[in-house]
């Protein structure tokens, strides 16, 4: 069971990035201090709306390369599990970056000719409500999880915003007031959050990013914890629906184990949701006040 490989920002996150960068550009001022690199910096894709949501294709951390190399590593470890003459099914949710991840993985594991030689077949599972309780994307088909504003999917964003408000205002003040960048105007929590996001996304594409040097170690620790918060309350132990959705995967795995070797020796499932995949979890609470 795996998510997709490394990707560009989603359209929602990318839109935030571009909006921030356009606002700073429109201010038409020379930036100082930590943000001075923006005077000569360009976004990490020339075709953002084409690349958003898709696998990264360049740099040492390219998603296409990562998926292929994962297939190669699996082959070196688990080739003995392959059954000669038996076609392996690879399940992928209906998202292009997931489908591409599965295809690159298959090329690394089964060889570049995996489709022509019928060594494996890629089965794409739609992310639609008529699929009901499938094991790949239950978060997209559980209505109560989607519609429950207090305890469902959106609770992760609520708790994230609460924690962002504890650590981001000080960063915004440092970048504007202390570093003499007042002319760009106040930075919102989401704008600073977008800056922190761009460190990782640019690193995936270019191998490094000047955004990473903008923030202190403590500020990065807060960002990492904030990422834990959103997943904890959106799809982890802090969400009352997580166990039910994770049970689908657990039940399917249990059924395969009971069936024994006759059911097959290799099973590959790749998924995409806006969260981490819902798996059975042990209760745990982030050690901080939100």
Predicted features and spans:
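Signature for phosphate-centric chemistry
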Residues: 1-87, 93-268, 274-290
């Amino acid at each position: 069971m795996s998510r997709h490989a490394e990707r560009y920002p989603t359209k929602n996150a990318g839109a935030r990035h571009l909006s921030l960068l356009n606002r700073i550009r429109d201010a038409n001022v020379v930036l100082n201090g930590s943000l001075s690199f923006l005077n000569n910096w360009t976004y990490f894709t020339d075709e953002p709306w084409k690349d958003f949501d898709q696998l990264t294709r360049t740099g040492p951390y390219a998603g296409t390369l990562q998926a292929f190399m994962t297939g190669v590593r699996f082959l070196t470890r688990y080739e003995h599990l392959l059954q000669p003459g038996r076609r392996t099914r690879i399940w992928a949710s209906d998202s292009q970056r997931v489908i591409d991840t599965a295809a690159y993985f298959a090329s690394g594991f089964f060889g570049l000719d995996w489709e022509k030689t019928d060594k494996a077949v890629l089965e794409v599972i739609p992310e639609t409500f008529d699929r009901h309780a499938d094991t790949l994307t239950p978060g997209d088909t559980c209505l109560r999880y989607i519609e429950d504003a207090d305890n469902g999917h959106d609770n992760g964003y609520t708790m994230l915003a609460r924690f962002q408000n504890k650590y981001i205002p000080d960063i915004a003040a440092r970048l504007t007031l202390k570093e003499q960048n007042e002319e760009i105007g106040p930075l919102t929590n989401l704008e600073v959050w977008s800056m922190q996001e761009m460190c990782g996304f640019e690193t995936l594409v270019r191998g490094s990013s000047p955004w990473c040097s903008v923030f202190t170690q403590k500020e990065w620790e807060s960002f990492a914890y904030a990422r834990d918060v959103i997943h904890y309350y959106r799809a982890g132990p802090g969400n009352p629906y997580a166990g039910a959705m994770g049970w689908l995967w657990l039940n399917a795995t249990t059924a395969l184990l009971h069936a024994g070797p006759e059911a097959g020796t290799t099973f590959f499932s790749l998924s995409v949701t806006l969260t981490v995949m819902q798996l059975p979890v042990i209760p745990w609470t982030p050690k901080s006040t939100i």
